[in-house]
Regions:
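Periplasmic alpha-helical coiled-coil/stalk elements that build and connect Gram-negative outer-membrane
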Residues: 2, 7, 22, 35, ...
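Acidic, low-complexity, intrinsically disordered peripheral segments
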Residues: 2-11, 24-30, 41, 422-446
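Bacterial N-terminal signal peptides
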Residues: 11-19
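Bacterial Sec-pathway N-terminal export signals of envelope proteins
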Residues: 23-77, 81, 233, 239-279, ...
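Small/polar, glycine/serine/threonine/aspartate-rich low-complexity segments that form flexible
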Residues: 25-33, 79-116, 242-250, 283, ...
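Extended amphipathic coiled-coil alpha-helical segments
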Residues: 53-71, 116-117, 124-157, 161-185, ...
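Residue-level detector of the transmembrane beta-barrel scaffold of outer-membrane proteins
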Residues: 75-79, 113, 126, 270, ...
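A short glycine-centered flexible hinge/capping loop motif at secondary-structure junctions
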Residues: 187-191, 399-403, 440
């Protein structure tokens, strides 16, 4: 997604938040953001500092790429020198003394120099190296985005799980409270024993404690999601979604895995690019055995033996020259050890890539197995919820007519609560395994 599109989405979200802003006791504005998974990912990609750092790193590599080819451009400089001779040197030859200049005079020289490389193999290879470095920075930025999308996706599903768990516990608590009210009323009429009243009250208070814990878990899940999105603490997020809505999208994972599946994995791509960089570095080191050719053009004005300091009144004489310099390396021991070291690094990188690919292949297979297992669990747990709900209805009727006990009623309610939680957990397990699989395979779901 383009950055402009992200910013537009963020502005729309800000308008929505301001529309729902309230003022509490401290007059701190509290905004509410209606959130979907797609919106959460878009906001995170636009605002997360890690992504911004990765994008700036790409710009730095592009600047380095520009610096590389600029080494082929001419280099021009101007130098000026004003020298005052206090005492000129003397030369003696066969008892004769010759003065090498004059005492107390000024010599002025102004020179312009132009240097330009004609053949610089190291520069050519460095230019190719920096282009590979830009690609590596882009792949690292892509890896950061994939990692962030994976974290946001799982945090979103974690929030859904916490939200659904809270709703289940709230529903169970309300049912237990209704049962306690009924049992307490019957106890007041002398129709049930005190044991039934105590059991119903214990059940209600136990579920109330679980409800409080579920509420804390929901708050923590939302906080984690907001941190990943880069959303401030005074913004509340509202998710009109639940895990049950994703049941229809559960697809049995393909058990077979192919070699091409991992071609988009960012870790393998980075290893390949690093190997390319090492190969390019090896070629740069080989250029240490090649000659270099440079062109130099020099022009200068000089004025000699001036007895005053007014340079504008000097008598200047021009001169110019050019030179072609050829440098041929003959021997440098460190060049050979550098090449040997780089070849060893390439070999290490190849072994690392092979091991990484094997581990990723096992991870992919594990995620697929978990997805297949979760689908089977979802199908089983769905039926368990239906049966547990039916059992609660039967236990309630039996207790109302005096054929059942409070223990049966409590057990049926606990079984229903557990069935709902297990059902939601199995869907969550599938979705998180699917998110990890997408991340491992380098799927860009953004």
């Amino acid at each position: 997604m383009k950055i402009k599109g992200k910013k537009l989405l963020l502005c729309m979200a800000a308008v929505m938040m301001m529309g729902g802003a309230k003022a509490q006791g401290t007059d701190a504005p509290v905004a509410t953001m209606d959130l979907t998974l797609k919106e959460a990912i878009s906001v995170a990609l636009a605002e997360n500092p890690t992504i911004k750092v990765a994008e700036k790193e790409i710009e730095l590599k592009k600047i380095a790429d520009s610096e590389a080819w600029q080494n082929l451009l001419p280099d021009a400089s101007i130098n000026m020198n004003l020298q005052h001779t206090i005492l000129a040197a003397e030369m003696k030859l066969n008892d004769m003394t010759f003065k090498m200049g004059k005492d107390g005079v000024n010599t002025a020289v102004g020179a312009a120099t132009l240097n330009m490389p004609l053949f610089a193999p190291a520069v050519y290879q460095t230019m190719k190296l920096t282009k590979q470095d830009v690609k590596l920075a882009q792949e690292k930025a892509r890896s950061s985005k994939l990692d962030l999308v994976n974290q946001v996706t799982k945090a979103y599903y974690q929030t859904l799980l916490a939200q659904d768990s809270y709703n289940v516990m709230e529903q169970s608590y309300n049912i237990s409270k209704q049962n306690f009210d009924v049992v307490n009323a019957k106890y007041g009429q002398g129709r049930v024993s005190e044991y039934d009243k105590i059991s119903a009250e214990v059940q209600m208070r136990s579920l109330n404690s679980s409800l409080v814990s579920a509420k804390v878990g929901l708050s923590n899940a939302k906080l984690q999601l907001k941190v990943l999105m880069g959303v401030t603490a005074n913004v509340d997020i509202k998710i009109n979604d639940k895990l049950e809505n994703y049941e229809s999208s559960l697809v049995l994972a393909n058990v077979e895995s192919s070699e091409s599946e991992l071609q988009n994995n960012s870790a393998l791509r980075q290893l390949d690019l690093n190997e390319s960089l090492l190969n390019r570095s090896l070629k740069i080191q080989h250029t240490n055995f090649m000659p270099t050719i440079a062109f130099q053009l020099t022009g200068q004005y000089q004025s000699l033996y001036n007895d005053h300091w007014n340079v504008f009144d000097y008598s200047w004489s021009p001169s110019a020259s050019f030179a072609i310099a050829v440098s041929i390396p003959l021997f440098k021991a460190s060049n050979f050890t550098k090449i040997k070291s780089t070849k060893m690094q390439i070999s290490q990188l190849q072994d690392t890539r092979l091991n990484t690919k094997r581990q990723l292949g096992m991870a992919v297979q594990s995620y697929k197995d978990n997805m297949a297992s979760s689908i089977a669990q979802v199908n089983s747990n769905r039926e368990a919820v239906k049966q547990a709900d039916k059992a609660v209805t039967i236990a309630s009727k039996r207790y109302e007519v005096g054929r059942g006990t409070i223990l049966e009623l409590n057990q049926s309610e606990v079984a229903l609560t557990q069935a709902h939680l297990t059902y939601n957990q199995s869907i969550y397990n599938y979705l998180t395994s699917k998110a990890d699989l997408d991340y491992t395979l380098g799927r860009e779901n953004f």
